[in-house]
């Protein structure tokens, strides 16, 4: 149903593909993931292909994005964290572009799918684990032993630290997924009020003014949320990478 606020999140198969009983179909979510990568890469290529001493608007945005993420990574993970800049910058641009594309009419918001955000979160935590053990060996386990804690309390503190670490991909993915899902549902509900009241004639148009104003305000807020959620995802990624670089630093 067109008035169903959750209809916009439904997955539809575009190219059905099944191999060995496993569904590998190319869906609308797959299409917009490809579109997200293409848009982000295309913008950065366009913005930097004709660089000048006096940057244009596109080049300025690209350079600001670069410096923004680089500064975030230095503050969150130190100078040694810059080796992860390509990863963090790619994640930031992917999430931001996906969020912004999802604001366009009839576009699909891939970050409103928990499987997408959870996959991104697992990638981040997996990188932390692989690098942590590669760089520090079993010394990485010092991450779960906070400095200054009396030995008698370690039996209580260590399990709490382990559970806290294991919950990171869950909290990281749900935070992004829930914010995008809730925001788009709210927008759809208010837009539905506007359409329904507007169809009732002059009286309905008058009654639709408040929902219309709310829709405009919420749209502006959602653009802000689109950036903030990409920022939060990148900041938390930097913090988690810092644990891999300095496992005994907390």
Swiss-Prot record:
UniProt-listed InterPro entries: ATP_synth_F0_asu, ATP_synth_F0_asu_AS, ATP_synth_F0_asu_bact/mt, F0_ATP_A_sf
Bilayer topology annotation: Multi-pass membrane protein
Gene3D superfamilies xref list: ATP synthase, F0 complex, subunit A
Keyword set includes Ion transport: yes
Superkingdom of the source species: Bacteria
Pfam families: ATP-synt_A
GO CC terms, sorted: plasma membrane; proton-transporting ATP synthase complex
Subcellular location, principal: membrane
GO molecular function terms listed in the Swiss-Prot or TrEMBL record: proton-transporting ATP synthase activity, rotational mechanism
Keyword Transmembrane helix: yes
Localisation per UniProt entry: Cell inner membrane
Transmembrane residue ranges: 29-49, 84-104, 114-134, 143-163, 189-209, 216-236
UniProtKB keywords: ATP synthesis, Cell inner membrane, Cell membrane, CF(0), Hydrogen ion transport, Ion transport, Membrane, Transmembrane, Transmembrane helix, Transport
HAMAP family in the cross-refs: ATP_synth_a_bact
Homology family: Belongs to the ATPase A chain family.
Quaternary structure annotation from Swiss-Prot or TrEMBL: F-type ATPases have 2 components, CF(1) - the catalytic core - and CF(0) - the membrane proton channel. CF(1) has five subunits: alpha(3), beta(3), gamma(1), delta(1), epsilon(1). CF(0) has three main subunits: a(1), b(2) and c(9-12). The alpha and beta chains form an alternating ring which encloses part of the gamma chain. CF(1) is attached to CF(0) by a central stalk formed by the gamma and epsilon chains, while a peripheral stalk is formed by the delta and b chains.
Role description: Key component of the proton channel; it plays a direct role in the translocation of protons across the membrane.
Protein name (database record): ATP synthase subunit a
Organism listed in the record: Allorhizobium ampelinum (strain ATCC BAA-846 / DSM 112012 / S4)
